[in-house]
């Protein structure tokens, strides 16, 4: 029942530490790689962890004195203890080879395998501290029930067989990567390949080409960058668009585009599971048009993470599928088909609550056991859910109009030289914060003044597509990428105050 923290980038040793902890019966506390030293100190102390497994790069920035409850700190590079405050623990570390030889004099054999069986499916397995867009981290308590249900769903829906390959590139400290890449892949007998750092789209594409994974799980940003850089430019011209409108040629172009897109991702995959953040509407429409095998999964850490998903063959455009097995999903709206309401859910995937935070738990799980996600969506008659935006992100104007910034950002992000954008409300006026694609702009000989003119042209063009109450009044150039969570969602709370 003791807590063990683990903080490092993806690696085989991360996986070993995780499995050693949960099979021993302790509670694992994965810490996201993006958390800084102060965050790590706070999580270690708040979780009352006894051991911390840490990578050498992270260890250099930590202060052991700031984590007084720890019995020991172990480097994940070679499992060497760098801090040991307990005599029994020190004894075990110093004499581990002798102790191992005494217990297994004829080496470790299959009959020695005896995993601890949890007393109850409700027993706590994981405490996962969120890194949300609101800036407040909470410890999500996931029981074995939730882990089992999520992994079981993957087995029910995905075709991975023993010996298949999976590239683990999502942070293992986040439940999306932990479940889809690691726990599901491991339990299916797949070969796991860990990308030990957050690589560029070029490195990711290279790894797909060499490893040829059977399934791919990733955040939208990765797919969008690869498709926009490698595929869309081939048809994003007058001739390409004209050919796409010709029925006979159209089918050939689609097949060619699908083949090229499949090659970028290794050609061997059954489907790409995209989740963690809103997906660009133009990129999705293109993928659907060419018959590319992608699906959108919707979930949150509090459900470990899966809430909605469907196979790519049945997925409807712009939706995130239906409620998964063992989960119920409702839209809190008088007219769920036409009027967006909050997504609420309950079922086997649900967390136990927030660690040492009963107040926050009661605010998200009601007395009837429904978890209130904070996301707004509609649901059609077949049960397909389409997320419209996040209730906390919704902008309310003085005239009473509800504006969902994600919908405007999705359009703006498809315009020339826009890398990413954020829509904020300033003095009851909509302002677009834009991080331009400087590399592309400079490669085309543009200067700062040219970029500013293009962004103003984009604003005018976009306003022609938007209703009067959604008009963008101003563009503000952002010179650095926006700060993001592990799921590559922009931390909106950091950009509410617009200067200039």
Where are these regions (language model features)?
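Short, small-residue-biased leader/transition segments that mark boundaries at the very start
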Residues: 1-6
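Conserved ATP-binding/catalytic segment of the ANL
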Residues: 130, 330, 337-397
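Gly/Ser/Thr-rich phosphate-binding loop
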Residues: 214-217, 227-315, 419
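Conserved AMP-binding/adenylation subdomain of ANL enzymes
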Residues: 148-165, 172-259
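Conserved pre-ATP/AMP-binding loop-to-beta segment of ANL
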Residues: 93-129, 136, 159-165
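Conserved AMP-binding A3 loop
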Residues: 125-149
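AMP-binding/adenylate-forming catalytic core of the ANL superfamily
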Residues: 35, 52, 347, 352-353, ...
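Structural core segment of the AMP-binding/adenylate-forming
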Residues: 23-103, 428
